[in-house]
UniProtKB/Swiss-Prot annotation:
One of its GO terms (biological process) is lipopolysaccharide biosynthetic process. It comes from Rickettsia typhi (strain ATCC VR-144 / Wilmington). SUPFAM superfamilies: NAD(P)-binding Rossmann-fold domains. Epimerizes UDP-galactose to UDP-glucose. It catalyses: UDP-alpha-D-glucose = UDP-alpha-D-galactose. Keywords: Isomerase, Lipopolysaccharide biosynthesis. The keyword tRNA processing does not apply. It is an enzyme of class 5 (isomerase). GO terms for molecular function: UDP-glucose 4-epimerase activity. Its EC number is 5.1.3.2. The gene is capD. PANTHER family: UDP-N-ACETYLGLUCOSAMINE 4,6-DEHYDRATASE (PTHR43318), UDP-N-ACETYLGLUCOSAMINE 4,6-DEHYDRATASE (INVERTING) (PTHR43318:SF2). This is UDP-glucose 4-epimerase. Belongs to the polysaccharide synthase family.
Length: 341
């Protein structure tokens, strides 16, 4: 897939960037690929990654997706782009919604426009379950990012830049997520702070996140959105599983939902489920290719009506305590924390 090609990863020093680079470095992909460009704004994280990975095919570019010129300059000669740069903390985006817009919407506009300008072959845009029926600023900004990508995809001619979207559930042990928080609280002997015990979240590993992007990269057509089917758990069961893994008897305190949080998340809306292709472990949501000539649709009508429910963390496979423990123990992050406990 990547033979003699140049790949750019925006936000490349984040959790996804580290995971995909780890995959590439452990496989033959790193031997086949021409160059991987890490584009991000944090020079310290770039320096740490440069030292830790120490590979001649990794090139580092300081820049911000908010600045079109910096992303356009860095994208010269790039064949493929994984767009992972984002503001993703829900409460932070609630307090600073314009910052979410500047990065997640306008930044995405810059990345997509630069990719088209530089005749990039394919772009995979990383989105989130919070973009489906959004109630918070982060989800709204990601929903608009998806709309931007699909709108631009709709305007592309055959042979031009292919734009696809991947939509994640909760990525376990990613930076700023609840699993590192719970483990920190356990190790410090503090109370485990749970927002709402019956709240459910999809459980997706960083390995799964890389699998999803590579699947979309291999199979994506113009304007496709890809979702990976994932199990879910309540937050309370997740906390108790970590307690058992670490042999902790820390008290649990319920603190109530944070700003902008939903009781459960949706990965596919009921409207999208009506047109989604079931690909086994994934759903593909094809682009709506209709134009603005609506008159004919009043005559022809819709071919399909949404008869299905949305795909949510409430109606997907729900893991019990034993199953959550088994899943958590497959995570490198949890194993490393156990060694250092």
């Amino acid at each position: 897939m990547f033979v003699d090609k140049t790949l750019m990863i925006t936000g490349g020093t984040g959790s996804f960037g580290n995971a995909v680079l780890s995959r590439f470095l452990k496989s033959n992909i790193i031997n086949d690929i021409k160059e991987i460009r890490i584009f991000s704004r944090d020079e310290k994280k770039q320096e740490d990654m440069r030292i830790a990975l120490n590979h001649s095919k990794l090139k580092f570019y300081i820049g911000d997706v908010r600045n079109y010129q910096s992303i356009d300059d860095a994208m010269h000669g790039v064949d493929y782009v994984f767009h992972a740069a984002a503001l993703k903390q829900v409460p932070t985006c609630e307090f600073y919604p314009m910052e979410a817009i500047n990065t997640n919407v306008l930044g995405a506009e810059n990345v997509l426009s630069a990719a088209i300008n530089n005749k990039v072959t394919k772009v995979i845009v990383l989105s989130t379950d919070k973009a489906v029926y959004p109630i918070n600023a982060m989800g709204l900004s990601k929903a608009l990012m998806e709309k931007l990508a699909i709108a631009k995809a709709r305007m592309r001619s055959p042979g031009e830049t292919i734009l696809c979207v991947t939509r994640y559930g909760n990525v376990m042990a990613s930076r700023g997520s609840v699993i590192p928080l719970f483990i920190h609280q356990i190790k410090q002997g503090k109370e485990l702070t749970i927002t709402e015990p019956s709240m459910t979240r999809f459980l997706m590993s960083l390995v799964d996140s890389v699998d999803l992007v590579l699947y979309a990269f291999e199979h994506g057509r113009q304007g496709d959105i890809f979702v990976q089917k994932s199990p879910a758990s309540t937050i309370e069961v997740l906390a108790k599983a970590l307690q058992e893994i670490f042999g902790s008897k820390n008290a649990i305190r319920f603190i109530g939902t944070r700003h902008g949080e939903k009781h459960y998340e949706s990965l596919v809306s009921s409207e999208d489920m009506a047109k989604a292709d079931d690909l086994g472990g994934y759903y593909r949501i094809p682009m709506d290719g209709r134009d603005l000539n609506y008159a004919k649709y009043f005559v022809e009508g819709e071919k399909k009506v949404a008869l299905l429910k949305d795909y949510t963390s409430h109606n997907t496979k729900r893991l019990n305590l034993k199953e959550v423990k088994e899943l958590l123990l497959t995570l490198d992050y949890v194993q490393e924390e156990l060694k250092n406990a």
